Amino acid sequence: MSPPRKLHIKSYGCQMNVYDAQRMVDALAPEGFVETANVDDADLVILNTCHIREKASEKVYSELGRLRVARDEAANHGRRMQIAVAGCVAQAEGAEIIRRAPVVDVVVGPQSYHNLPQLLAKAEQHGRALETEFPIEDKFGVLPQPAPDAIRARGISAFVTVQEGCDKFCTFCVVPYTRGAEMSRPVAAIVEDVKRLAENGVREVTLIGQNVNAYHGDGPDRLAWSLGRLVRRLAEIPGIVRLRYSTSHPNDVNDDLLAAHRDLPALMPFVHLPVQSGSDRILAAMNRKHTADDYRRVIDRFRLASEAIAFSSDFIVGFPGETERDFSATLALVAQIGYAGAYSFKYSPRPGTPAADMAEMVPAAVMDERLEQLQQLIDQQQSAFNKAAIGRTVEVLFERAGRKPGQIVGRTAYLQPAHVMAPDSIIGKVLPVRVDSLERYSLLGELASATSRPADAMAATGA
């Protein structure tokens, strides 16, 4: 029997890439690959790339330079290391990657991960393999399912892709070009995925997509289901106690989703709703197709559905042409909404996007100053949100052992890390925790009760 081949995947960027990395592991497991955390031991290294942030391509080529050294060292010991570039940089640059970095054996776009075994074999025979087309077949229908042991090893929380691609064409964003048009998976396939996860110990599922609330998958009644209707079906699955979704677009929030937040205890009251700017002028230049007031009204609709809902968001400072007045409008929006957390970034041009050709680039020093000012406000809001938990009892889903002996770590409904001293038998359970103090962004406390119910019992009762 041949010894297993070792696989190392380095993922950059979004939650979708984390999910994609797991599916690549699943696709390669039948070929005898097992994961390793040590890149130097790997027979195959995959860089699972992201094209959203600044200098994404340069980071990939820098990493490939380091891998060339590791590959040469492996060859000196009589071992062949294959190198693959996957993800959105692979989709955007294709053959250019092989031209600039001959060390690369395989370049594969996000829609073709199910073909990885064949691409690796092709590279073994012919030296290189490239696949960045958008194939007709649904990759989700042909990717192997993870083995039960693999599911259990990944913990009690899992991602499930329900939607991929984007039709919004924001002027700063490459996603429509690298992930393609919006595609929604059938309801039945998603239900089967989540059932399989629940049967193997998963208690929390995050539904992911580039524009997840645009979900419109075919249901068993042959009608297109909304995200809200899908969530209702998934909440019925025994064992699933928490459901989340990310990332959303304000224009696709509908009554079905709001009603699900109103009615379903399993749907967590924490919504990531990017807005990018508080200036109507900049929002128009970004092609967001909504105004700041439109966004405020969406927030109000969520809060009417459930007073418990809190929000996070994404912001870009220094978009071409952004003035001090535009930036002040962003600060005003943040101050008015009050976020539990948010991500802020300096604008960086993505080749091939309309914004990359816009004039009036904001000076780097101005962007730095605005980013610092915005992040200070966001940090203040996040700190206030976390401090409000002190003295309260909150529900925590416990996930794993902590760094300290006897410490168990879980997360609240708002994704705040929570630490208690307790036996590891509480992992997989939702328990009340009395919060005593904070340590940076984590809540510290004690179990509020010695009695508990496992997460699957809570899911079944709707608690």
Swiss-Prot record:
It comes from the Bacteria. Residues 5-125 form the MTTase N-terminal domain. Its main location: cytoplasm. It is an enzyme of class 2 (transferase). Belongs to the methylthiotransferase family. MiaB subfamily. Monomer. Keywords: 4Fe-4S, Cytoplasm, Iron, Iron-sulfur, Metal-binding, S-adenosyl-L-methionine, Transferase, tRNA processing. Pfam families: Radical_SAM, TRAM, UPF0004. It comes from Rhodopseudomonas palustris (strain ATCC BAA-98 / CGA009). [4Fe-4S] cluster 2 binds at C166, C170, C173. [4Fe-4S] cluster 1 binds at C14, C50, C88. One of its GO terms (cellular component) is cytosol. Residues 387-449 form the TRAM domain. It catalyses: N(6)-dimethylallyladenosine(37) in tRNA + (sulfur carrier)-SH + AH2 + 2 S-adenosyl-L-methionine = 2-methylsulfanyl-N(6)-dimethylallyladenosine(37) in tRNA + (sulfur carrier)-H + 5'-deoxyadenosine + L-methionine + A + S-adenosyl-L-homocysteine + 2 H(+). SMART domains: Elp3. It is found in: Cytoplasm. This is tRNA-2-methylthio-N(6)-dimethylallyladenosine synthase. Its cofactor is [4Fe-4S] cluster. HAMAP family: tRNA_metthiotr_MiaB (MF_01864). GO terms for molecular function: 4 iron, 4 sulfur cluster binding; metal ion binding; N6-isopentenyladenosine methylthiotransferase activity. Disulfide bonds: none annotated.
